[in-house]
């Protein structure tokens, strides 16, 4: 069970939140504990960081959870209701490090601060408790601090809404990254729900509790685990959704934002409301919600996404993934944009080719590209700095990040101004040029070179930016010199060379002269008006002046006033920056776009990639293709070069469907690598990247499916074979004539004849029904005879050489079928005992002899093709005629029925079924 949703009702000996909120608990609590209980009751699903002096303390179940997650000591603090109070704490100065660990573990944290001075509390009574309140709700999807965020990954909060209308419910997703302001919406369907969620990779998914507990969707949320956080269904009310979004953006209508479905509005409204709740009504600088069409991106199902290791390997590491192999970006924004593009490849050839044009332009100008990348290297993460400033969490270094980013943008704009650019890069250049130059000039004139982390430390406004601030700093830092100057002035004015300005705790600053020299200050009207007598000593007299008194006050208040001026300047600069939020975000996206294009251009040159031809045809012709990840790994290891192989799944002349290659060959021959590399080349091409091939022509793929590798799902009671069949079923049910399917070893997890039969039928289905482009690797050599009847099916094999009883894997793909799998040779290489290998050879010889007496080629004549078998089954069903229930259903018109009539009809149908 998700511990986030169950934080208020954990079992065990520790008092729960409901126990603490009881009358008995409140009546027996100390004033401090009563305050804690009240605040905790308002935040039951969060760990409460309760500020006490220099520590954040946690009590009761929160302490138990936090001590376990953080690996810190669990101690005790007195008793409550007859039970000891578990307690642990973390120092305030190190709180971010502990928050990072808790957020990474999926916890939500409410940060409770002291909101008044202890002296103020004492005015209400000697036993009054200092007021405390929650100033921040920290959740995995709503963090903005650099320490808690990965610079190269987006940090999405996602909302899932479901609207029941008609026979099928409507689903929609809204996702927000408050650290960058991205806000997007998309409709989805139950069948692709998990795939769409995993494509976005949210850190936190909020959804109605009614949806969370829907048994039909349980498998989805089991996969997501603690990422899914149920919320009250009222948060997703579509009736009030448009009004809530309009209020957030301060507009009267959303018509200017575009057209959205009810489900999309419900999801967007829930996301916005959750952001406001967690930010305590502060509003991050969110962009206008952008609507994504499901058809605009390549559909990649969850199993395929995992098997192809796009962003992470199966072990969860970024190293070894496709993303890691392609990433040559210089900025955090560029790294995030590349990851987003790779996870959501396009299906529109025009947009794909715009991206490819940008890479080609930069690849053709290597020196220019190097200069652009050098300038990009100096661009900080402007969107995240902007978000912190908008939320009131920013510091001087965030202003500095905006300043440095705008400087880098100006340098890049100058580089691009006279260059030959693609349409995409021209648009990016224009967005950069639209940055307000006066804002950069103001930042340059205001900010110091060295900036502190916290604004309360001061020192971030440069000298000369404010005359009053310079004066206050001079008084604060150079008070002795100022006093000495004033003393010299008074000496000259009075002619008393022994005049001194001194200081004590009683009089403060004062002028002291000997009694014999005081005449010029006491005997004339001008002297008495100028010098005010303060004290007479035995041998001296002390005076002050209005000027000295004012100077004393200024010196005493100079530090406070200097900081106040800096804070006022900071707030003014923040307002100016936030007012230009849209221009800054547009420029930041432009910089990221340039960074991605330049990085992929460098990659193409470095790895000898080529520009693919991408269009709306059904072509899939790869000449000299390579696996991008494996090839780079071999180069790093200084091993043998990667063996390139072609692949042509284009429709044969006159045929409408795509071609299928049936790939046979030995274990360790490279079948799986070949399958994966072609899928990755398709993804790279539709991402808008050059590809590892000598040439490539790809008609856009709408859906990509793979069934590669073996794994079980013990938690859900699924064997390896069951998982294989579920994934294969999804492919056969969803693949279209524009899809690309790669299947590896279908049917290997069961008895030989069962597996062969399933693989046989699957190949026929792909050819006759799906009509997709496909690669089908198998050790069932009997399947190769299908090429005689299936016109778009071709046999291909991984080539090997035998030498003195050893097998040499050439890793080359060629036409034809393998006559054996060389499994025994691989077993010998793996170190199986010689006796086992010898026995295996004997058994294999007998089995092969038996197989020659009943060759598989006879099956092709004995078995009808897939479509024939399907037609027979359909004919058998048709001959029986429709049932009474089917006839009754056809006669019903739900739109013309009252609720009562519909209920009566339902009972009648149920009764008819019971009588059968």
From Swiss-Prot:
This protein's UniProt keywords: ATP-binding, DNA damage, DNA repair, DNA-binding, Nucleotide-binding
Superkingdom in the source lineage: Bacteria
CDD domains tied to this protein: ABC_MutS1
GO BP terms, alphabetized: mismatch repair
Residues annotated as binding ATP: 665-672
GO MF terms, alphabetically ordered: ATP binding; ATP-dependent DNA damage sensor activity; damaged DNA binding; mismatched DNA binding
Stored PANTHER family: DNA MISMATCH REPAIR PROTEIN MSH1, MITOCHONDRIAL (PTHR11361:SF34), DNA MISMATCH REPAIR PROTEIN MUTS FAMILY MEMBER (PTHR11361)
Family: Belongs to the DNA mismatch repair MutS family.
Name of protein: DNA mismatch repair protein MutS
Species this protein is from: Rhizobium meliloti (strain 1021) (Ensifer meliloti)
Lineage, broadest ranks: Bacteria, Pseudomonadati, Pseudomonadota, Alphaproteobacteria, Hyphomicrobiales
Gene of this entry: mutS
């Amino acid at each position: 069970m998700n511990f986030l949703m169950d934080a208020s009702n954990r079992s065990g000996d520790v008092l729960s939140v409901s126990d603490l909120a009881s009358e008995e608990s409140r009546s027996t609590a100390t004033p401090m504990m009563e305050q804690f209980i009240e605040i905790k009751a308002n935040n039951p699903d969060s760990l409460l960081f309760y500020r006490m002096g220099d520590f954040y303390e946690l009590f009761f179940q929160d302490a138990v959870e936090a001590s376990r997650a953080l690996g810190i000591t669990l101690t005790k603090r007195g008793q409550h209701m007859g039970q000891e109070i578990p307690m642990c704490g973390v120092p305030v100065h190190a709180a971010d490090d502990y928050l990072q660990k808790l957020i990474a573990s999926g916890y939500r944290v409410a940060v409770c601060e002291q909101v008044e001075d202890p002296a103020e509390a004492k005015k209400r009574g000697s036993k009054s408790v200092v007021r405390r309140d929650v100033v921040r709700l920290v959740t995995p999807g709503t963090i903005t601090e650099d320490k808690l965020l990965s610079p190269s990954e987006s940090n999405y909060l996602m909302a899932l809404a479901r609207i029941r209308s008609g026979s099928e419910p409507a689903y929609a997703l809204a996702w927000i990254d408050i650290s960058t302001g991205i806000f997007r919406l998309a409709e989805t369907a139950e069948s692709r729900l998990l795939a769409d969620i995993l494509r976005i990779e949210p850190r936190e998914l909020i959804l109605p509790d009614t949806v969370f507990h829907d048994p039909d969707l349980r498998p989805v949320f089991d996969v997501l685990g603690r990422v899914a956080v149920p919320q009250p269904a009222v948060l997703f009310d579509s009736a009030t959704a448009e009004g809530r979004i309009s209020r957030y953006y301060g507009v009267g209508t959303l018509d200017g934002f575009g057209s959205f479905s009810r489900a999309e509005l419900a999801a967007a409204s829930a996301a916005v409301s959750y952001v406001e709740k967690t930010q305590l009504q502060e509003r991050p600088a969110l962009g206008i919600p952008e609507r994504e069409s499901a058809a605009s991106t390549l559909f990649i199902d969850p199993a395929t996404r995992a098997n192809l290791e796009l962003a992470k390997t199966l072990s969860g590491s970024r190293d070894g993934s496709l993303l890691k192999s392609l990433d040559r970006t210089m900025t955090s924004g560029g790294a995030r944009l590349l990851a987003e593009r790779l996870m959501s490849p396009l299906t529109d050839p025009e947009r794909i080719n715009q991206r490819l044009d940008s890479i080609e332009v930069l690849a053709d100008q290597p020196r220019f590209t190097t200069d652009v990348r050098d300038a990009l290297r100096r661009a900080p993460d402007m969107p995240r700095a902007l978000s912190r400033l908008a939320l009131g969490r920013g510091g001087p270094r965030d202003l500095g990040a905006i300043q440095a980013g705008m400087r880098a943008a100006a340098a890049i704009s100058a580089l691009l101004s006279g260059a030959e650019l693609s349409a995409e890069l021209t648009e990016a250049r224009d967005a950069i040029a639209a940055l307000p130059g006066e804002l950069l000039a103001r930042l340059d004139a205001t900010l110091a070179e060295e900036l502190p982390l916290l604004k309360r430390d001061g020192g971030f406004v440069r000298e000369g930016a404010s005359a009053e601030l310079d004066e206050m700093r001079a008084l604060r830092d150079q008070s002795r010199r100022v006093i000495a100057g004033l003393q010299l002035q008074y000496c000259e004015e009075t002619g008393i060379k022994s005049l001194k300005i001194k200081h004590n705790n009683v009089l403060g600053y004062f002028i002291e002269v000997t009694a014999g020299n005081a005449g010029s200050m006491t005997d004339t009207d001008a002297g008495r008006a100028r010098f005010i007598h303060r004290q007479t000593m035995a041998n001296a007299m002390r005076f002050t002046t209005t000027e000295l008194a004012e100077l004393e006050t200024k010196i005493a208040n100079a530090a406070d006033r200097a900081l106040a001026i800096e804070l006022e300047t900071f707030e003014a600069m923040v307002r100016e920056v936030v007012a230009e939020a849209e221009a800054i975000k547009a420029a930041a996206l432009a910089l990221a776009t340039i960074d991605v294009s330049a990085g992929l251009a460098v990659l193409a040159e470095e790895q000898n990639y080529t520009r693919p031809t991408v269009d709306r045809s059904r072509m899939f012709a790869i000449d000299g293709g390579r696996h991008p990840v494996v090839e780079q790994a071999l180069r790093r290891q200084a091993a043998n070069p990667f063996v390139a192989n072609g692949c042509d799944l284009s429709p044969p002349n006159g045929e409408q469907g795509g071609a299928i290659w049936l790939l046979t060959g030995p274990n360790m021959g490279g079948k799986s690598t070949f399958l994966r590399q072609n899928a990755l080349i398709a993804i790279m091409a539709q991402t808008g990247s050059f590809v590892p091939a000598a040439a490539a022509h790809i008609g856009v793929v709408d859906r990509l499916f793979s069934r590669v590798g073996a794994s079980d799902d013990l938690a859900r009671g699924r064997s390896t074979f069951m998982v294989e069949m579920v994934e294969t079923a999804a492919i056969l049910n969803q693949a279209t004539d524009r899809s690309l399917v790669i299947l590896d070893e279908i049917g290997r997890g069961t008895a030989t004849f069962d597996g062969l039969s399933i693989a046989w039928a699957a190949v026929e289905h792909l050819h006759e029904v799906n009509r997709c482009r496909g690669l089908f690797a198998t050790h069932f050599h009997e399947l190769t005879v299908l090429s005689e009847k299936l016109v778009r099916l071709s046999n291909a094999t991984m080539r090997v050489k035998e030498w003195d009883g050893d097998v040499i894997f050439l890793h080359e793909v060629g036409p034809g079928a393998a006559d054996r799998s060389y499994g025994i040779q691989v077993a010998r290489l793996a170190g199986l005992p010689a006796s086992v290998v010898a026995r295996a050879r004997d058994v294999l010889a007998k089995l092969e002899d038996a197989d020659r007496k009943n060759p598989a080629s006879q099956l092709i004549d004995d078995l009808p093709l897939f479509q024939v078998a399907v037609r027979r089954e359909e004919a058998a069903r048709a001959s029986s005629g429709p049932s009474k229930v089917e006839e009754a259903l056809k006669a019903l018109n739900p739109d013309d029925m009252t609720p009562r009539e519909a209920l009566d009809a339902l009972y009648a149908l149920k009764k008819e079924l019971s009588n059968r």
